[in-house]
Amino acid sequence: MIFWLRSVIVTFGRPAEWPRCLRHLCSRGAAMDLGPMRKTYRGDPEAFEETHLTSLDPVKQFAAWFEEAVQCPDIMEANAMCLATCTRDGKPSARMVLLKGFGKDGFRFFTNFESRKGKELDSNPFASLVFYWEPLHRQVRVEGPVKKLPEEEAECYFHSRPKSSQIGAVVSHQSSVIPDREYLRKKNKELEQLYQEQEVPKPKYWGGYILYPQVMEFWQGQTNRLHDRIVFRRGLLTGDSPLGPMTHRGEEDWVYERLAP
């Protein structure tokens, strides 16, 4: 940890190792200046140029980067993503979830329909996904409309999960207020006994969504903060539509551009 005190930078380790006066300041809500916290990213020779695109189809480009993330030993969950949703009156919320499949038709994830994200997607069926692979200094952002997956697909995936996860989905009415953790333990134990010798039925309030990508942005970090940003968006379907001088035609109905960092 770095703490600014009268223009002197003082560096500390874990909170338990901080001086008592600093722990007191933090507990009192003192402002923390995190300005000096920064990491070295890539150098200019490793810049992400347009010629480095694996494909002019952004879903295929995502697949290439995703595979690199999967193969990277320092990335524990390459399919972890931040899912951002929003109420109809503009109040956003975000949380980490797991990507469970992707292809030309979209990006799949599963959750509880009665959760906050489920309710927000019901009233405002648009979302944004962000994948951040820190060891590779890469980020991918995906935006688009969201719809529920067919019940058969949700049923199939639900029963492919470990039985403990299936029971967990039945136990937890996600985002509802509960008295304590013991409440979950007790209910979980009851259902483990109930379904010991039988299949766990998928709750009606649990299922999947698919986000159809309309915008996909690929970001790669540079140490000098002149980061690389190449964004794909769905353009006009007519092949003879004129493009701007800095807009390039991708595959099918995609166009792409470089954005200032």
UniProtKB/Swiss-Prot annotation:
<dbReference type="InterPro" id="IPR019740">
    <property type="entry name" value="Pyridox_Oxase_CS"/>
</dbReference>
<feature type="binding site">
    <location>
        <begin position="174"/>
        <end position="175"/>
    </location>
    <ligand>
        <name>FMN</name>
    </ligand>
</feature>
<dbReference type="InterPro" id="IPR019576">
    <property type="entry name" value="Pyridoxamine_oxidase_dimer_C"/>
</dbReference>
<dbReference type="InterPro" id="IPR012349">
    <property type="entry name" value="Split_barrel_FMN-bd"/>
</dbReference>
<keyword id="KW-0560">Oxidoreductase</keyword>
<feature type="binding site">
    <location>
        <position position="139"/>
    </location>
    <ligand>
        <name>FMN</name>
    </ligand>
</feature>
<feature type="binding site">
    <location>
        <begin position="225"/>
        <end position="227"/>
    </location>
    <ligand>
        <name>pyridoxal 5'-phosphate</name>
    </ligand>
</feature>
<feature type="binding site">
    <location>
        <position position="219"/>
    </location>
    <ligand>
        <name>FMN</name>
    </ligand>
</feature>
<comment type="pathway">
    <text>Cofactor metabolism; pyridoxal 5'-phosphate salvage; pyridoxal 5'-phosphate from pyridoxamine 5'-phosphate: step 1/1.</text>
</comment>
<dbReference type="InterPro" id="IPR011576">
    <property type="entry name" value="Pyridox_Oxase_N"/>
</dbReference>
<comment type="pathway">
    <text>Cofactor metabolism; pyridoxal 5'-phosphate salvage; pyridoxal 5'-phosphate from pyridoxine 5'-phosphate: step 1/1.</text>
</comment>
<feature type="binding site">
    <location>
        <begin position="42"/>
        <end position="45"/>
    </location>
    <ligand>
        <name>pyridoxal 5'-phosphate</name>
    </ligand>
</feature>
<keyword id="KW-0663">Pyridoxal phosphate</keyword>
<protein>
    <recommendedName>
        <fullName>Pyridoxine-5'-phosphate oxidase</fullName>
        <ecNumber>1.4.3.5</ecNumber>
    </recommendedName>
</protein>
<feature type="binding site">
    <location>
        <position position="100"/>
    </location>
    <ligand>
        <name>pyridoxal 5'-phosphate</name>
    </ligand>
</feature>
<dbReference type="GO" id="GO:0042803">
    <property type="term" value="F:protein homodimerization activity"/>
</dbReference>
<feature type="modified residue" description="Phosphoserine">
    <location>
        <position position="241"/>
    </location>
</feature>
<feature type="binding site">
    <location>
        <position position="157"/>
    </location>
    <ligand>
        <name>pyridoxal 5'-phosphate</name>
    </ligand>
</feature>
<dbReference type="GO" id="GO:0008615">
    <property type="term" value="P:pyridoxine biosynthetic process"/>
</dbReference>
<dbReference type="GO" id="GO:0030170">
    <property type="term" value="F:pyridoxal phosphate binding"/>
</dbReference>
<dbReference type="GO" id="GO:0005829">
    <property type="term" value="C:cytosol"/>
</dbReference>
<dbReference type="GO" id="GO:0004733">
    <property type="term" value="F:pyridoxamine phosphate oxidase activity"/>
</dbReference>
<dbReference type="Pfam" id="PF10590">
    <property type="entry name" value="PNP_phzG_C"/>
</dbReference>
<keyword id="KW-0285">Flavoprotein</keyword>
<dbReference type="GO" id="GO:0042818">
    <property type="term" value="P:pyridoxamine metabolic process"/>
</dbReference>
<keyword id="KW-0288">FMN</keyword>
<dbReference type="GO" id="GO:0010181">
    <property type="term" value="F:FMN binding"/>
</dbReference>
<feature type="binding site">
    <location>
        <position position="165"/>
    </location>
    <ligand>
        <name>pyridoxal 5'-phosphate</name>
    </ligand>
</feature>
<comment type="similarity">
    <text>Belongs to the pyridoxamine 5'-phosphate oxidase family.</text>
</comment>
<feature type="binding site">
    <location>
        <begin position="95"/>
        <end position="98"/>
    </location>
    <ligand>
        <name>FMN</name>
    </ligand>
</feature>
<dbReference type="Pfam" id="PF01243">
    <property type="entry name" value="PNPOx_N"/>
</dbReference>
<comment type="function">
    <text>Catalyzes the oxidation of either pyridoxine 5'-phosphate (PNP) or pyridoxamine 5'-phosphate (PMP) into pyridoxal 5'-phosphate (PLP).</text>
</comment>
<dbReference type="GO" id="GO:0042823">
    <property type="term" value="P:pyridoxal phosphate biosynthetic process"/>
</dbReference>
<keyword id="KW-0597">Phosphoprotein</keyword>
<feature type="modified residue" description="Phosphothreonine">
    <location>
        <position position="238"/>
    </location>
</feature>
<dbReference type="InterPro" id="IPR000659">
    <property type="entry name" value="Pyridox_Oxase"/>
</dbReference>
<keyword id="KW-0664">Pyridoxine biosynthesis</keyword>
<feature type="binding site">
    <location>
        <position position="229"/>
    </location>
    <ligand>
        <name>FMN</name>
    </ligand>
</feature>
<feature type="binding site">
    <location>
        <position position="161"/>
    </location>
    <ligand>
        <name>pyridoxal 5'-phosphate</name>
    </ligand>
</feature>
<feature type="binding site">
    <location>
        <begin position="116"/>
        <end position="117"/>
    </location>
    <ligand>
        <name>FMN</name>
    </ligand>
</feature>
<comment type="subunit">
    <text>Homodimer.</text>
</comment>
<feature type="binding site">
    <location>
        <begin position="110"/>
        <end position="111"/>
    </location>
    <ligand>
        <name>FMN</name>
    </ligand>
</feature>
